[in-house]
């Protein structure tokens, strides 16, 4: 006897399962089954496809008029941080620049101070609250970066918190050491601080899967970033890079040359960089909510990347300064509107390709896969990025069990 059948599904989303990320035109290929059925036993998918009455189960969910998809994957977050920076919104409205806010004690260094002052247990409680919000919105796989400690003690603290979260909730969660995220005030130079972070790599390896660096004007150069990435690979890490967010320094080209698993942001990437994606499996992780939140007009050139047969994914970039959202559904809407992605491209970018960007087996619904699914209160898959700003996830299913039920009930 099976454990659960989800029947009469209006649309069942079945992303293509591949060893490598979907590239170029492949991203627009999405198998959407009308009147579908999913059968689950022992936390695994037994069947997913056209409606059938050939299976029995102890529990049945009628998904008439609903969409079922793989659980979403958020491939770029800064989940563990102390404090918040809502007071900076009024400063921005007054016309204060980021550098002016930084000089006033705000910006990223404000978050660094708050993170340093927050105990590990309190940091865990805050991050847990934010993670549960993600889960309620349909996310069951997450990448979590450090980068707000900027010293040994507090970078380790952030990584330990994300590891504790993964253990408590048994999630597909990857952890990224982003020590070189900024340069703290106490550092004698960028170069000296970078060497401090490189020296930490062997110690943080037990807590982190990836090593990341912020390659940008005024932070770390291309040469420094390459040095760090090579040292990280020597220490056994797969590497990522925050690249070309503001200036076209060549971060995307560097990521491809160093065989990074992903390059993230890429708002200002050059045509040369986009062309190099053609022969690379490095995933371009685009973060349109960041561009939106910062009030900028120029978004990453997703269409240019796809035209060059590149692989792209989408993520929230959840952080307290430039993308204060942990709702990946909102990112899907912004990507459709501003990156000009089709519904199929959007869905693949938050499932199977996002999984490839963090090196996990997720984002598909195939026989034998973990039964990590979302039942959406939506008539079709195009409706979710169309009707933006709300939570369409009705039920979230992890390992075959409903762990979130957002069904609303009211008393008159």
UniProtKB/Swiss-Prot annotation:
One of its GO terms (molecular function) is iron ion binding. N-formimidoyl-L-glutamate binds at residues 148, 319, 321. It catalyses: 4-imidazolone-5-propanoate + H2O = N-formimidoyl-L-glutamate. Its cofactor is Zn(2+); Fe(3+). Its main location: cytoplasm. Binds 1 zinc or iron ion per subunit. Pfam families: Amidohydro_1. One of its GO terms (biological process) is L-histidine catabolic process to glutamate and formate. Keywords: Cytoplasm, Histidine metabolism, Hydrolase, Iron, Metal-binding, Zinc. Zn(2+) binds at residues 76, 78, 242, 317. It comes from the Bacteria. GO terms for cellular component: cytoplasm. Its EC number is 3.5.2.7. Fe(3+) binds at residues 76, 78, 242, 317. 4-imidazolone-5-propanoate binds at residues 85, 148, 181, 245, 322. Belongs to the metallo-dependent hydrolases superfamily. HutI family. Catalyzes the hydrolytic cleavage of the carbon-nitrogen bond in imidazolone-5-propanoate to yield N-formimidoyl-L-glutamate. It is the third step in the universal histidine degradation pathway. This is Imidazolonepropionase. The gene is hutI.
């Amino acid at each position: 006897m099976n454990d659960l059948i989800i029947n009469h599904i209006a649309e069942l989303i079945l992303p293509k399962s591949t060893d490598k990320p979907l590239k170029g035109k492949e991203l627009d290929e999405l198998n959407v089954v009308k009147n579908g059925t999913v059968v689950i036993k022992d936390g695994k998918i037994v069947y997913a496809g056209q409606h059938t009455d050939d299976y029995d189960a102890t529990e049945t969910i009628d998904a008439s008029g609903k969409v079922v998809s793989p659980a979403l994957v958020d491939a770029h977050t800064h989940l563990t941080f102390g404090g918040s920076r809502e007071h900076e919104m009024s400063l921005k409205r007054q016309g204060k620049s980021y550098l002016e806010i930084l000089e006033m004690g705000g910006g990223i260094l404000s978050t660094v101070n708050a993170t340093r002052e927050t105990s590990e247990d309190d940091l865990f409680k805050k991050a847990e609250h934010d993670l549960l919000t993600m889960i309620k919105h349909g996310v069951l796989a997450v990448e979590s970066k450090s980068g707000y400690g900027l010293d040994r003690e507090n970078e380790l603290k952030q990584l330990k918190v994300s590891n504790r979260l993964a253990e408590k909730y048994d999630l597909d969660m990857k952890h990224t050491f982003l020590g070189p995220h900024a340069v703290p005030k106490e550092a004698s130079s960028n170069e000296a601080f970078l060497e401090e972070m490189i020296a930490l790599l062997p110690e943080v390896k037990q807590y982190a899967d990836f090593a990341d660096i912020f390659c940008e004007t005024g932070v770390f150069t291309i040469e420094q970033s390459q040095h760090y990435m090579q040292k990280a690979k020597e220490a056994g890490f797969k590497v990522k890079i925050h690249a070309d967010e503001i200036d076209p320094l060549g971060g995307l080209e560097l990521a491809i040359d160093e065989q990074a698993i992903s390059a993230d942001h890429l708002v200002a990437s050059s045509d040369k960089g986009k062309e190099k994606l053609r022969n690379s499996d490095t995933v371009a992780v685009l973060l349109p909510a960041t561009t939106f939140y910062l009030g900028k007009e120029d978004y990453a050139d997703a269409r240019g990347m796809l035209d060059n047969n590149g692989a792209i994914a989408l993520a929230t970039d959840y952080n307290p300064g430039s993308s204060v959202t942990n709702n990946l559904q909102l990112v899907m809407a912004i990507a459709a509107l501003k990156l000009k992605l089709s519904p199929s491209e959007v869905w693949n970018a938050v499932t199977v390709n996002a999984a490839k960007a963090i090196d996990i087996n997720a984002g598909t619904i195939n026989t034998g896969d973990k039964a990590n699914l979302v039942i959406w209160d939506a008539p079709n898959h195009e409706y979710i990025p169309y009707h933006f700003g709300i939570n369409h996830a009705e039920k979230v299913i992890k390992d075959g069990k409903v762990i979130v039920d957002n069904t609303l009930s009211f008393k008159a």
